[in-house]
């Protein structure tokens, strides 16, 4: 006979921060009777999900990858942004074997060094300082043909903020005496993670064939033309920028292609289009034989050189539950599925023993303000059924709405997104109460609580560094102040009566009352 389990659920409300200022604060203005009631009835606090508390530079906004790694590992994990910036500062970057080999091999056959990545100071998927270091390294080692394919942000940065960065790189190449910004395209196309291959194909064709919707004389001209077309950075259509002789840079056999994004989830699809022999996402007109370098490991089954391999995280929450013969469920929509699985497990693709996964398809809409509830009802249907089954000791669930709709900059839609999640939380808590379960309700970082940039008046589409909520719906308890995301796994294990592995340096911040 199967033992009925009383699950402990962790509900992660993605992009749901706390902000004192109520202006254009979608979290504040949303009608959220369920969460209001839970806050009034149960222990709650605010915890940190940004900066040094999650292994990022001081003041750097958190993000979903970082948040889930810190939650799942139960320790502060120093992030790739910090790690690579330090390597550049120390000079180690200039001797990195994967990078130097790709450059040198291209030079040896008179090939080109192509560099692609999100040209942004956002620090979420990449940093333009890293891209500059890569351009300088290629020229320093003797490359005569250096081509930068710039993916534009406007999501982790203000919607129209790419121009200064593009101007800087044009001046950089002039000062270096070689190299050019060869193409620009919005991240909406180049960095899709939801199998919308029609978008990715536009970036692939731009880089391999020089095929584009637009052509401009300079990168600055390209962004100005995009703004004239009313395209924000994220949505800039494919634009090729010929050199002074009118030549268009195309990726060909024996060239190097170095991808300077350090975050995996939005780097995987376009990487596979370049390196997978059996790729079938779209029809590729050309498949050049190139030396491809991933800045970090985007997936274990992608066959390409890695400049900075992942460090192994052991005794994460998922692994600990496995080792103690406890069952666990991970559930989310497509947009955040990798976060509750791959990232939560410390960068491991394969499920642990006793770990089940449920993926709910995110709606196929151009932007999520068109459907702010996303697939939350279907997600909650599956989650409630899993709770009622009493099969799981631990359930990890992510509701993407606050983040995905927050990124659109649409305040009214973000309010609706928060309201949809609140309704779902009510159903989940009711199901848990019926089976004697408990839950922690928290977030991974802020977003929807700030929908306008107060300094510019533009829509605010980026994450924030605000504190995030934590509610314990369970026994009589107190929550200590000063908590961080890395405290959640030790707290969960303690609530379950389990010992905390020594690798988890977070602390249990919920103290049960006698």
Curated annotation (Swiss-Prot):
Single GO molecular function: phosphoglycerate mutase activity
Similarity field: Belongs to the BPG-independent phosphoglycerate mutase family.
Recorded catalytic activity of this chain's protein: (2R)-2-phosphoglycerate = (2R)-3-phosphoglycerate
The protein's Enzyme Commission number: 5.4.2.12
Residues annotated as binding Mn(2+) 2: 14, 64, 444-445
Cofactor binding comment, as recorded: Binds 2 manganese ions per subunit.
A GO BP entry: glycolytic process
Annotated binding of substrate, by residue: 125, 155-156, 187, 193, 263-266, 336
Protein name per the record: 2,3-bisphosphoglycerate-independent phosphoglycerate mutase
Entries under NCBIfam families matching the protein: pgm_bpd_ind, PRK05434.1-5
Pathway involvement of the protein, from the record: Carbohydrate degradation; glycolysis; pyruvate from D-glyceraldehyde 3-phosphate: step 3/5
Cofactor(s) needed: Mn(2+)
Lineage: Bacteria, Pseudomonadati, Pseudomonadota, Gammaproteobacteria, Alteromonadales
SUPFAM superfamilies referenced in this protein's UniProt entry, alphabetically: 2,3-Bisphosphoglycerate-independent phosphoglycerate mutase, substrate-binding domain (SSF64158), Alkaline phosphatase-like (SSF53649)
Active site residues per record: 64 (phosphoserine intermediate)
One GO CC term, this protein: cytosol
Keyword line: Glycolysis, Isomerase, Manganese, Metal-binding
Subunit structure: Monomer.
């Amino acid at each position: 006979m199967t033992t009925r389990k009383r699950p402990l659920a962790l509900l992660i409300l993605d992009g749901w921060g706390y902000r004192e200022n109520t202006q254009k604060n979608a979290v504040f203005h949303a009608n959220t009777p369920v969460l209001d009631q839970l806050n009034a009835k149960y222990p709650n606090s605010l915890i940190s999900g940004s900066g040094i508390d999650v292994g990022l530079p001081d003041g750097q906004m958190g993000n979903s990858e970082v948040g889930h790694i810190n939650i799942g590992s139960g320790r502060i994990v120093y992030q790739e942004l910090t790690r690579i910036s330090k390597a550049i500062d120390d000079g180690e970057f200039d001797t990195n074997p994967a990078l130097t080999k790709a450059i040198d091999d291209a030079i040896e056959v008179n090939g080109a060094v192509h560099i692609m990545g999100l040209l942004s100071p956002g620090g979420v998927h990449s940093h333009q300082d890293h891209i500059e270091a890569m351009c300088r390294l290629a020229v320093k080692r003797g490359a005569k043909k250096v081509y930068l394919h710039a993916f534009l942000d406007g999501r982790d940065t203000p919607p129209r903020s790419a121009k200064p960065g593009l101007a800087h790189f044009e001046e950089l190449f002039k000062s270096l005496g070689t190299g050019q910004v060869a193409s620009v395209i919005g991240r909406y196309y180049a960095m899709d993670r939801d199998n919308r291959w029609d978008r990715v194909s536009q970036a692939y064709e731009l880089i391999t064939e020089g095929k584009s919707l637009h052509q401009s004389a300079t990168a600055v001209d390209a962004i100005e033309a995009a703004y004239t077309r009313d395209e924000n950075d994220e949505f800039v259509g494919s634009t090729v920028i010929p050199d002074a002789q009118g030549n268009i840079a195309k990726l060909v056999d024996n060239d190097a292609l170095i991808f300077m994004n350090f975050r995996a989830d939005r780097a995987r699809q376009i990487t596979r289009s370049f390196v997978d022999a059996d790729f079938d996402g779209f029809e590729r007109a050309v498949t050049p034989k190139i030396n491809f370098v991933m800045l970090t490991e985007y997936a274990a089954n992608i066959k390409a050189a890695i400049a900075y391999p992942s460090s192994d995280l052991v005794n994460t929450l998922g692994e600990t539950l496995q080792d103690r013969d406890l069952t666990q469920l991970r559930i989310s929509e497509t947009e955040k599925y990798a976060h509750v699985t791959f990232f939560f497990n410390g960068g491991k693709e394969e499920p642990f023993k006793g770990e089940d996964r449920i993926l709910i398809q995110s709606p196929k809409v151009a932007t999520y303000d068109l459907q702010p509830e996303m697939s939350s009802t279907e997600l909650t249907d599956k989650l409630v059924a899993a709770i009622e089954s009493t099969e799981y000791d631990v359930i990890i669930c992510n509701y993407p709405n606050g983040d995905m709709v927050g990124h659109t900059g649409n305040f009214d839609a973000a309010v609706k997104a928060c309201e949809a999640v609140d309704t779902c939380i009510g159903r989940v808590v009711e199901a848990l109460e019926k089976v004697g379960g408990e839950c922690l309700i928290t977030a991974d970082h802020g977003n929807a609580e700030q929908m306008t940039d107060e300094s510019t008046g533009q829509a605010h589409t980026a994450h924030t560094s605000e504190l995030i909520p934590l509610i314990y719906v369970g026994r009589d308890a107190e929550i200590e102040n000063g908590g961080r995301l890395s405290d959640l796994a030790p707290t969960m294990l303690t609530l379950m009566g389990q010992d905390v592995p020594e690798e988890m340096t977070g602390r249990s911040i919920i103290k049960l009352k006698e």
